[in-house]
C-alpha cells in the first residue's frame, strides 16, 4: 500500500462519516432518523419520515460520499484493488460514522456512488436491478440485498479486475442488512412506501 492510497482511504472514511441523513433532517426540522421510523439514517427512512425532497437530498449526498474519493483515487492512478478498498472505506464511514457515534446507515447509496466510476453500464445495471426489485416486491431492503449479491457478477461482466473488492463490499452490505433479513422472515419488514410499524 502506497502512502497516497492510505491517505485516500482515510479521506474516504472521514467523508463517509458525514451523516447526510442526520444533517439534512436537522436542517429541515425533521425527527432524527436514528430514533424515528426504522431508526436507519438513510434515504429510505428519511423518505418515510420527511418525504421526497429530503430523501432526494440525502440520496444525492450519500452517492457523492462514495463517488468523490473513488474518482479521486482513479485520477491519481491508484490500482484497481486499492480503489476497491477506498470504496469500502467510504461505505464503512457511512455505516460506522466517526462523527455520529458510529451509528450509520446500510451503505447502499454510498456503494452505488463508489461503483459509479467503474462505468455507467455497471451503474445502470445496479440501479435497474434495484428499481425492478422494488417495483416487483415493494421492499427497499430486499432490492438492496439482491442488487448487492448480483453486483460482483455485473462487475465481472464489465470490468473483471474490480470483481474482488466489489464482492467484499457486497458482503459488507448484506451483513449490514441482518436485521432486515430477520424482520423479513418474521413478516415484520416494512415496504418502502409504508411507515415503520411501532
UniProtKB/Swiss-Prot annotation:
Protein's recorded name: Glycerol-3-phosphate acyltransferase
InterPro entries reported in the protein's UniProt record: G3P_acylTferase_PlsY
Annotated pathway: Lipid metabolism; phospholipid metabolism
Lipid bilayer topology: Multi-pass membrane protein
Gene: plsY
EC number: 2.3.1.275
Family the UniProt entry places it in: Belongs to the PlsY family.
SS bond list: none
Key words of the record: Cell inner membrane, Cell membrane, Lipid biosynthesis, Lipid metabolism, Membrane, Phospholipid biosynthesis, Phospholipid metabolism, Transferase, Transmembrane, Transmembrane helix
GO molecular function, one term: acyl-phosphate glycerol-3-phosphate acyltransferase activity
Biological process per Gene Ontology, one example term: phospholipid biosynthetic process
Subcellular location field: Cell inner membrane
Quaternary assembly: Probably interacts with PlsX.
One cellular component term from this protein's GO annotations in UniProt: plasma membrane
NCBIfam families according to UniProt: glycerol-3-phosphate 1-O-acyltransferase PlsY
Keyword Lipid metabolism found: yes
Membrane-spanning segments: 4-24, 53-75, 80-102, 112-132, 134-154
Entry function: Catalyzes the transfer of an acyl group from acyl-phosphate (acyl-PO(4)) to glycerol-3-phosphate (G3P) to form lysophosphatidic acid (LPA). This enzyme utilizes acyl-phosphate as fatty acyl donor, but not acyl-CoA or acyl-ACP.
Reaction catalysed by this enzyme: an acyl phosphate + sn-glycerol 3-phosphate = a 1-acyl-sn-glycero-3-phosphate + phosphate
